[in-house]
Amino acid sequence: YMERRVWVTARDGERIPVSLVWRRDVPTCDSAMFITGYGAYEISSDPGFAVSRISMLDRGVLYAVPGIRGGGEMGRAWYEQGHLLNKKHSFEDFIDATRALQRAGLASPLRTVANGGSAGGLLMGAVANMAPECYAGVEADVPFVDALTSILDPSLPLTVTEWDEWGDPLHDADVYAYMKSYTPYENAPDSEND
């Protein structure tokens, strides 16, 4: 197996690190791609070993982990550029990393699946809404997709502590409007079957 870190350029010019893992004897052009992200709480996402990934890698899937803003991959300032009123950088970075890898010929949108859980599930909902053309599928594990409704209720056990990460939309109209502009539930496209 091979691992390589590459750098891609986000729409605002920031350079985003992306870790790639693939099976050494499998060509990396037009592969199926499994791209996963988190981008919150200053937590770094690294392509650590997991036996469950071996089957996927053995089938020729390229495993990609972009270190998007909001995570801790590049230090405190990196985190600060991806939380509160900068949260959209996380989503844009993930989409831009996906597109850069696809433009490089590593995968096509028809063979790209995105994955994230919890806050990464919010990431998945946002990127599915913002750039559905980039992904054949999106897997959101325990997603935080109705973030605005949840974070408006201070009686919920985690709400007040979550204000440090997302902002306090209950008492700040700017935070409310910003969260409403990206939360997956608030921005889900209308069904064509209505």
Q: Which functions belong to the PLM regions below?
A:
Residues 1-117, 152:
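Cap/lid segment of the alpha/beta-hydrolase catalytic domain
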